[in-house]
Amino acid sequence: MPLVPLEHLDEVREELVKARKSRHRRLLVITGDDDSRLVTTALDFIYNVKDLLSGEKVLYTYHAFYSDGAMRKELFEKGVPRELSVDYVSYHKLDEVLGRTYAAAVADLVNNLEPNDLGRVMGVVEGGGLYIFLLPSFTRLLETVTRFQSNLIVPGYTDKDLKRYFEKRFIKKVMEHQGVAVYDADNRYWVKKFGKTPSTPYARPKPVLPQKSKIPVKVFNLALTQDQVEVLKIFEHFYAKAEKEKLVFVLTADRGRGKSSAVGLGVGWLAHRLRRAKGKCKVVVTAPAVTNVQEVFRFSAAVLDLFKHKVEVLEDESGMITKLLSKGIEIEYVTPLDVLKAKGDLLVVDEAASIPVPLLFKMLKRFNKVVYSSTIHGYEGAGRGFSLRFLKRLKNEEGVKLYEYEMSEPIRYAPEDPIEKWTFDLLLLDAEPCEITEDDLSLVSAGEVYYDAPNEEELFLKNEEELRQFFGIYIMAHYRNNPNDLGIMMDAPHHFLRMVRLKNGKIVVSLELASEGNLGEDLSKESAKGAWLMGNIIPDRLIKHYKILDFGNLRGIRVVRIATHPSVMGKGLGSFALSRLEEEARRNGYDWVGAGFGVTYELLKFWLKNGYIPVHMSPEKNPVSGEYTVIVVKPLSEKAKRIVDVIAKEFKQKLLGSLASPYFDLEPEVALLLLKSTPSFEVKVNLTKLQLARFLTYAWSDMTLENCIDVVGIMTRLYFLSKKKPSLSELQELLLVSKILQAKSWHLTCQELNLSLAEATSNMKQIAQIFSKEFLGVNSEEEALRYFFLRMDDLNEGVSA
């Protein structure tokens, strides 16, 4: 006997029958505080539609690290109809099944309502399928501290300080949307029914195949949509040799449009065709994570199987495909950074919007045929900012033949799916900034803008249009966004928002900020010993690396993210936002404002222009962006100024000694900017007579640099540390950074600085002579001559100046 009344069961069945006709999905949210009732209710609903699900897979996802989560999973497993095939997957392993398609998915969200989990799971169910969410009662949900939220409670805050706007937004959106129902398992009643949903039958249009093509019909037959056929037709162009110009394909789509599988079909055919033409083919595949490219590999393998290739599939320890091997064919995943060392006939860059534009162009330099694909809206979406940042610049590149295509038809379900609409709305996956008109540009030019502190409850729960403007700027401007960014913004007690608006109210700059510091003695000591302090990134790094406990007592604001509307960039709005933030911070007794970011020349210049001082750089590059993370701080109080001055001087000395390793591959321009923006101080020349003799023989005679590079290194460090220094050109300073401080070969130095060997060696000799005059007071070969011929009696003293 089912726990749920029969009429309630039939309502879900009728709704699912209707959904199957229209190839749309439904979401049933079951709430309850009794675990047994919660699971039994879910099973009752599943039993009543089991004939609609039989023969197809069902996903059950849960939090394996919670004993009650494991217990609910066991209850479900014992009660589920035997004829259903169920995959039980813990959330931390969900990436492993993202390429699979399910008829239904049960998501246990009792322990953790995490935005990323929702973003990932909402794409796996096919049209006509059912999602079931298991949740505590909404009252208890707003009192429970989830696993996601527990990581947001940083020192100085308690669970009572959690803002809980994400949970409130979740409840609001569940109650607003059609196709979503809420059932109270404890009291057995509908909190909300599915509402009016379309029941128009949907049949996917049969793709129209090309009359003539190098690609056989059997490959085209694997394409499910016309979009996928069009992508394959573009791949046909990539069979030609890239002789006079590079071949580039930029493919974009919302999530769930079959983008990666279409690329896989094209890669499989091209690998087969090139192998037949020239005996071998190597395809390099990259993405921020190997999980992003599983569909590329699966569909490439399917096409190779069509052509009777014996394919060996290599997987990593987590079961992710990393390589396909066949006779004369290799399709391999490499990390974005390692692409710069790889070679191949074709490069495929999936989720390209998550990789910085400079790195994408470095990849293009290395390969003659490149496919860049990226999600516009969805879990890994980057909005249309990718097109703005990348395509605009790509179109200005000479020697590039560019193909573009945007896919629109969903693969797993019909267009206008209500559950896709709900997901996009809840997680702001399709948020875009406001449109900027000529009148708006006039307001910017006239300085008619203002700094605003929004009411966050109003913004997150009521002012939907303003929230979409605010968050849309981040999607448009930043490399990587995921739903957890939104969750942190909405729930973290130490995070707060500011914005710059035009006089007419439009949002043009978005700032997400975090209060940090005020740690006290004990926490500061823990950090100094190596403990990781949650939510205090700048104090934690500075105390860890410089051991000055006093910094932990200061209060600061970290700029988590600052982004300007793309249509009004370069007009001083970001700097205006920072200046107003600093004024607000001073009024409220803060000691500093700071930021951490993946360092590029342009970004560093922005922060330096606004008076921020570099104080730390990570020793490792980010594996996706290929950038080092730099921390900058602007002291506001006198105490902060004293501490930051000491730390910045130490950072400068540390950097001078670290450019050969670990910062060997840091761009010389960035290194130079860091060195010139940190404090200089009084230093003395301190050379032995023999060091002096070698240096002067190099400067004024015929000794080679290699024979005195140790002394040139001393003099170079002296130059960058010293307050009183001679005037060198920027090229000469870059030469010192690359050749001396980073210890690069002449070949690499000349390549980086676009110099001939003769120009580089001549400039280095000039630098040595300038150092000789300014630091040592030796102005010519005649004056240096007395150091060329030494006796033992001359060696008693060193040289100080």
Curated annotation (Swiss-Prot):
Its main location: cytoplasm. It is found in: Cytoplasm. Gene3D superfamilies: 3.40.50.11040, 3.40.630.30, P-loop containing nucleotide triphosphate hydrolases (3.40.50.300). It catalyses: cytidine(34) in elongator tRNA(Met) + acetyl-CoA + ATP + H2O = N(4)-acetylcytidine(34) in elongator tRNA(Met) + ADP + phosphate + CoA + H(+). GO terms for biological process: rRNA acetylation involved in maturation of SSU-rRNA; tRNA acetylation; tRNA wobble cytosine modification. Residues 457-637 form the N-acetyltransferase domain. GO terms for molecular function: 18S rRNA cytidine N-acetyltransferase activity; ATP binding; tRNA binding; tRNA N4-acetyltransferase activity. PROSITE patterns: GNAT. GO terms for cellular component: cytoplasm. Keywords: Acyltransferase, ATP-binding, Cytoplasm, Nucleotide-binding, RNA-binding, Transferase, tRNA processing, tRNA-binding. The keyword Nuclease does not apply. Belongs to the RNA cytidine acetyltransferase family. TmcA subfamily. Catalyzes the formation of N(4)-acetylcytidine (ac(4)C) at the wobble position of tRNA(Met), by using acetyl-CoA as an acetyl donor and ATP (or GTP). This is tRNA(Met) cytidine acetyltransferase TmcA. It comes from Thermofilum pendens (strain DSM 2475 / Hrk 5). The gene is tmcA.
